[in-house]
Amino acid sequence: MAVVARVVLNGITKEQYDAVREETGWLKEPPVGGLSHMTWWEGEDCHNADAWESEEAFNAFGAERLGPAMAKLGIQAELQVTFHPAHEVYLPQPVTLTV
């Protein structure tokens, strides 16, 4: 079942986020089961809204790629994750926009 993952990383900077994105290579090799990913900041906290094929796919990406990348870069941000069953995931066209 598809899920929406709401993720908060307290205190991670935009530079750290960009370094993690580069280290994991998720733009070149999208995570298995990842459907969409959006990121924004509120104050010093990084927020993400993702659509995934399943919680298991999200957790596998975290264990196999995200966690190791953060550890390698010395980033110690705790992920606060809540999952919600997706009623609909609509992606009219593939697009990647980065600032």
Q: What do the PLM-derived regions correspond to, one by one?
A:
Residues M1-A49, E53-G67, G74-V99:
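Short S/T/G/P-rich N-terminal loop/turn motif that feeds into the first structured element of a domain
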